[in-house]
Amino acid sequence: MLSLTPASLGWRHFYGMGARMSGMKKTILKVCFMLGSILVSAIAQADTPQVSAFDMQANGIDYRIFVAAPAKKAPAEGFPVIYMTDGNRMLPIAAKLMGENPKLEAVFVGIGYPTDDKDEIVRLRYFDLTPPTPDDLIPVQTNIPKTGGRDAFFDFINHQVKAEIESRFPIDPTRQALFGHSLGGLFTLYALFNHADSFQSYAAADPSIWWNGRSILADKDRFVEAFKANPKPMRLLVESSGKRGERPGRTKEEIKHLKKLRSGPSGADIQTELKQLPDFEAAYRRFDNESHGSMIPLTVEDSLKFILLNESPSAQNN
């Protein structure tokens, strides 16, 4: 690749003879620098992912699908693809990471909603990412959200969203992954335990295992027994935060209720069990100094590297 810098032109000529340059030489030098600027700009643009969005509808809910894809030509087998829940928040982080690291070559797909209203997004995600849940097992005491849309949401992603993405981008069907955080992490584990063949890699960040009386553990037990009978290569990254965020305004009773709801096995416990399975790669990382929210950009980066570069953060604690 051509590199036009002062060094390539010769330091002595660049600094020591500028005053005696002829008009022609000055013109040539200006052209060289102009070409160099164009080249640098072209390289930067080549590393900038192509970001787009389009809307879909399923089960009476409007969705916005956010996409970041490499600007370069796809390999013969197609690009890997990573589907991400909470797309409004996660896709911009993933797109930025792709722009900073050209090795992260994949199509990133964030499933989100066509609104910037945070309360509306919270309401919708509570429904899409959860099984039907009794009110007394929901940590919200007022304006209790509707739950139970998980199965329909998975079918929407697995059939409609995948089909649309594959019609727009060259995708490698053997390298598909799912990422989720919090309730999205719970959804990722649900997909793994109930629809394992839908993706080859999974990343669950601070998964809400405690949700609905820890019903996900029954799914896990069934998955483990079935997997032992028919093992196949599978990959999972689980990460967790180390700090609990403050919850001002809650009464002692509410805090006690919340603590009871969130007790029980953790993501680390699930990873410890799954890594014992044949052909199952399960990695884990705990961010001791990060909260549930502050870990997000860090865990997105870890997940992309785990899925695309086979870089495992296992046994690392921060």
Q: What are these model-predicted stretches?
A:
Residues 5-7, 19, 27:
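Ala/Thr-enriched low-complexity intrinsically disordered regions
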Residues 47-318:
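Non-catalytic cap/lid and distal C-terminal segments of serine-dependent acyl enzymes
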Residues 42-46:
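Sec/Tat signal peptide C-region and signal peptidase I cleavage site
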Residues 15-17, 21, 41:
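Intrinsically disordered, low-complexity segments enriched in serine/threonine/proline/glycine
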Residues 32-41:
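Bacterial N-terminal signal peptides
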Residues 22-32:
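Bacterial N-terminal signal peptides that target proteins for export
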Residues 14-15, 33:
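Aromatic (phenylalanine/tyrosine) cluster motif
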